[in-house]
Design a protein with these regions (language model features):
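C-terminal-most transmembrane helix of multi-pass membrane proteins
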Residues: 2, 45, 242-310
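Transmembrane alpha-helices of multi-pass small-molecule transport proteins
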Residues: 35-84, 109-115, 162-166, 182-198
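Structural signature of hydrophobic alpha-helical transmembrane segments
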Residues: 37-48, 90-108, 149-161, 205-218, ...
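Hydrophobic transmembrane alpha-helices of multi-pass small-molecule transport proteins
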Residues: 52, 82, 126-143, 155, ...
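Helix-helix packing/entry segments at the starts of transmembrane helices
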Residues: 100-107, 170-188, 218-254
């Protein structure tokens, strides 16, 4: 069925904004944990993989194995990219101030735009302008005291590039359900870090924070991203998701763990303005989807749909 892009675009924006809000909890939740990095990653991966697996089982009406087989090479690529991005992002947060990591994540729209161009996606002049404003806002935020170390910078860039690549693959392969790929990515994270984790560190309050990181900050965020990336161009997804980088430092500030400088506040306002510029952009372009835009809970057995069947 053919539907207008203006019909589906609000849903793509909403899904991506929800992903950004969930992702923004990473810094504040990570700061509450008192355990080694391997235990953090392995523990979060357990909850994330279980949450997404349950979703896949319900959405596919018990046909879990066929669902995982259907992802093919694109789904495997997304799973690997998500694995690397997840591990690198939390590693960066553990050794670098939240605001510094967020500044580097702001480059994702540019990376996604370049990758999208290579795969044939057009980029409108207004989108380029909005991206420039967003990056400029984070450049202002970078004026805050302190610079990230080499290791923190490296892990932040790795996470950013893998995140951008995930957006492009998900958009270009809209017929592939990314829910099983999301689950697989967390299984891979667990497999990599579990041998170095310590179960004794995961009790008490730590267990609750790990559950929040796995189910909300990781599982739901990646799921909403996979939905949003199928409804709007890769570069728009990457730009709207920059709200994560504004909200992340905000939560840490509200908790009294880090206090933003004036440049950070000014930069955050600029970024919000850039996002507003992008999401209010009208378009008469058309896109072909397998379901009507009003069917938010479409048939998940359709390989082109990773949403839940009510």
């Amino acid at each position: 069925m053919t539907v207008t892009r203006t019909d589906t675009r609000p849903f793509g924006i909403a899904y991506t904004a929800l992903a950004a809000a969930a992702w923004s909890l990473a810094g504040i939740l990570q700061r509450q944990l008192h355990m080694g990095l391997a235990s953090q990653l392995a523990g979060r991966a357990v909850f994330a993989s279980l949450a997404v697996f349950v979703f896949v089982a319900v959405a596919e009406r018990g046909r879990v194995i066929p669902a995982f087989r259907a992802i093919g090479r694109p789904g495997l690529a997304v799973a690997v990219l998500m694995t690397i991005s997840s591990g690198s992002f939390i590693t960066a947060l553990s050794i670098t101030p939240v605001a510094d990591v967020m500044v580097i994540q702001a480059l994702a729209p540019l990376a996604a735009a370049l990758l999208g161009m290579l795969s044939g996606e057009p980029v409108r002049p207004r989108t380029w302008a909005a991206m420039g404003v967003a990056v400029g806002g984070f450049a202002v935020m970078a004026g805050a005291p302190g610079r990230p170390g080499l290791a923190g910078t490296a892990f932040s860039f790795i996470a950013m590039f893998c995140y951008a690549a995930t957006i492009v693959v998900a958009r270009r392969k809209a017929e592939v359900s990314m829910a099983p790929a999301t689950c697989l990515s967390q299984v891979l994270v667990f497999a990599v870090f579990a041998p170095f984790a310590h179960v004794s560190e995961m009790g008490g309050v730590n267990l609750g924070y790990l559950a929040l990181m796995g189910v909300v900050q990781m599982g739901l965020a990646l799921f909403f991203l996979s939905l949003g990336a199928r409804l709007i161009p890769a570069v728009e997804v990457a730009l709207i998701a920059q709200l994560e980088n504004v909200l992340g430092p905000l939560w840490v500030w509200l908790a009294g763990l880090e206090y933003p400088s004036v440049p950070t506040i000014i930069g955050g306002v600029i970024v919000i303005g850039a996002v507003a510029l992008q999401v209010t952009q009208g378009s008469g372009a058309r896109a072909r989807l397998r379901r009507p835009p009003g069917d938010l809970l479409g048939d998940a057995r359709d390989p082109g749909d990773c949403t839940l069947k009510a």
